[in-house]
Curated annotation (Swiss-Prot):
Inhibited by the neuraminidase inhibitors zanamivir (Relenza) and oseltamivir (Tamiflu). These drugs interfere with the release of progeny virus from infected cells and are effective against all influenza strains. Resistance to neuraminidase inhibitors is quite rare. This is Neuraminidase. Substrate binds at R116, R150, E275, E276, R291, R368. InterPro entries: Glyco_hydro_34 (IPR001860), Sialidase_sf (IPR036278). The lineage of its organism: Viruses, Riboviria, Orthornavirae, Negarnaviricota, Polyploviricotina. It is a single-pass type II membrane protein. Ca(2+) binds at D292, G296, D322.
Length: 470
């Protein structure tokens, strides 16, 4: 075979192989398309991934097809029903730990907000910790002077319960130096108070959007609960104060639907003082235990009906639960009048259990240190001193602070009753410690049908921080 014949033979063979390759590729494509059309959902190469972002952003649907991705944004379905919340409170024999954020310990080296007034509130699908930031981080120069209650830098933010109040997981809620928040079953409602002391404004947000406002009506530091508001059958209730902290002020109950105020009523309470109420739903009504910052070491009680009628008085128990306070043995108790003649006070809480009451208080009578919850037989209706249960949450060697109530809805627990829960703030820094800042962490407890041993779930951060030594 001469050279020309060899070239022709090799070329013919190559052309034949090429044609065969093309035919095989065409057949392969046809078969693949036919199979995918007939049974596309059964192959691993075609899959759908659903990711959900926070509460109100979107659902992202990604369909992956070999090396091609198609991204489609669809509306996130909203919750269809309002929560009922007319069930009774569950009977609690003790309180078990639910969460602890350790924010200050983590904040010594993490990006954690300087906060105060943390509180917890729950939706049908989750519980969140809300807190008022100071627009600054722990162990940073902007934390200097954060003992101040009211500033233009304060904002209400939230994280999923148990998370520290860090910059990476926190969600902005409102501009506020006083606040409340609750979920009606469909969306979150927040009330954030901000502005100058004599003309403060409360902005009502629903689903993250401003819907209504409340202007100061007494011109003296309009303020609200610093704990969860209460929603029953789609109507949400909260209490506000406007006026002096050390004498008679003005108090109002507000009612909103979908974030729009549909009712309000003034509370007549001459001689009494109401601030920072801790409220919860119970048998279709809103029950609140509040703070008397004027004279009483017993706590005001407020029970609100759906038509905004109310009863107001004081926790009857013959054991005082505010701080500062006198000796238990010297306190008689009253259902109608403030007793104790001790000014100032601290936000606190309690739960009615029939005619009994669970009531939280600091262990110290004079300072915000230690924390215990006690059960007083007939303490809701009588001047009883019969303490039938006591559980220590924080020992008296460690700082506590505000405390407040919330409930776990039946949608979360699948019970036929509302689980009573509470949180305790643990304040660190100024004025008790040598730092340039004031902040706090929290421990959260929920009622169970067993006795729980006392212990100390204290903050545990080692102070001062590096910034305090400069």
């Amino acid at each position: 075979m001469n050279p020309n014949q060899k070239i022709i033979a090799i070329g013919s063979a190559s052309l034949g192989i090429l044609i065969l390759n093309v035919i095989l590729h065409v057949v392969s494509i046809i078969v693949t398309v036919l199979v995918l059309n007939n049974n596309g959902t059964g192959l691993n190469c075609n899959r759908t991934i659903i990711r959900e972002y926070n509460e109100t952003v979107r659902v992202e649907r990604i369909t992956q097809w070999y090396n091609t991705s198609t991204i489609e944004y669809i509306e996130r379905p909203s919750n269809e029903y309002y929560m009922n919340n007319t069930e009774p409170l569950c009977e609690a024999q003790g309180f078990a730990p639910f969460s602890k954020d350790n924010g200050i310990r983590i904040g010594s080296r993490g990006h954690v907000f300087v906060i105060r007034e943390p509180f917890v509130s729950c939706s049908p699908s989750e519980c969140r910790t809300f807190f008022l930031t100071q627009g600054s981080l722990l162990n940073d120069k902007h934390s200097n002077g954060t003992m101040k209650d009211r500033s233009p830098y304060r904002t209400l933010m939230s994280v999923k319960i148990g998370q520290s109040p860090n910059v990476y997981q926190a969600r902005f809620e409102a501009v506020a130096w006083s606040a409340t928040a609750c979920h009606d079953g469909k969306k979150w409602m927040t009330v954030g108070v901000t502005g100058p002391d004599n003309q403060a404004v409360a902005v009502v947000n629903y689903g993250g959007v401003p819907v209504d406002i409340i202007n100061s009506w007494a011109g003296d530091i309009l303020r609200t609960q610093e704990s969860s508001c209460t929603c029953i059958k789609g109507d949400c209730y909260w209490v506000m104060t406007d006026g002096p902290a050390n004498r008679q002020a003005k108090y109002r109950i507000f009612k909103a639907k979908d974030g729009r105020i549909i009712g309000q009523t003034d509370i007549s309470f001459n001689g009494g003082h109401i601030e920072e109420c801790s409220c919860y739903p119970n048998e279709g009504k809103v029950e609140c235990i509040c703070r008397d910052n004027w004279t009483g070491t017993n706590r005001p009680i407020l029970v609100i009906s759906s038509d905004l009628s109310y009863t107001v008085g004081y926790l009857c128990a013959g054991i005082p639960t505010d701080t500062p306070r006198g000796e238990d043995s010297q306190f008689t108790g009253s259902c109608t009048s403030p007793l104790g003649n001790k000014g100032y006070g601290v936000k606190g809480f309690g739960f009615r259990q029939g005619t009994d009451v669970w009531a939280g208080r600091t262990i110290s009578r004079t300072s915000r240190s230690g924390f215990e919850i006690i059960k007083i037989r007939n303490g809701w209706t009588q001047n009883s001193k019969d303490q039938i249960r006591r559980q220590v949450i924080i020992d008296n060697l460690n700082w506590s602070g505000y405390s407040g109530s919330f409930t776990l809805p039946v949608e979360l627990t699948k019970k036929g009753c509302l689980v009573p829960c509470f949180w305790v703030e643990m304040i660190r820094g100024k004025p008790e410690e040598t730092t340039i800042w004031t902040s706090s962490s929290s421990i959260v407890m929920c009622g169970v049908d067993h006795k729980i041993a006392s212990w100390s779930w204290h903050d545990g951060a080692i102070l001062p921080f590096d910034i305090d030594k400069m």
